[in-house]
Amino acid sequence: MAAFLMLRVGVMEKDEELIDDALNQYYWHIKYLQNPSSGLWYHGYDNIAGDHMSGIYWGRANAWAAFTMSQVGGILPQCYLYPKYIDIAGSLNEQLAALKVYQTENGLWRTVVDDPESYEEISASAGIAAAMLTRGNPLHSKYINKSIKGLLANVSEDGKVMNVSGGTAVMRDKEGYRGIPKAYIQGWGQGLALSFFATLLVSDEIQKDGAL
């Protein structure tokens, strides 16, 4: 998430050093957190033990990764001239291809992506759907359309985004993630839902990054 802010500031200030630092942050997050076999992102990494702790594919972690990576091509002018952007685009493509498999019948994703016993979680679902929408791949269209109904069903008449999990540490096991309450309004739920619906309104105007 910090890399996204750094990149935006770097582009606004025309600060190539800050842009490079932001892309470096993306690059090493990919190397340490994405499983190259599954395409999914782990919730955490222990640099001392050299492992992914409980090894859980947390939904919102995958949403943050997908959403922030999807923004780079539209923010960074001539993104294709930055070698690390190719890593970002490749990582995102593989992640979104993997996530499609785990979309539920309700058009949502679960708080533990690959755990059918964990609950559907709305901030993760909104972030993943927003990333698909921003990426602009026509193969994502049916998953995006399915998400619209699922997300709308979890927004109250007064605009509250419901069924958003609370702040979540790297839990010991899947049961720990299943136990995180989702009864309260959370800023990240409101924000990611707004990002999805706002992107939906301007989807025809999104700047794509070509064949990358």
Please provide the spans of the model-predicted regions.
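Oxyanion-binding "anion nests"
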Residues: 66-113
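Acidic/Ser/Thr-rich, low-complexity mid-to-C-terminal regulatory regions of eukaryotic proteins
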Residues: 40-60
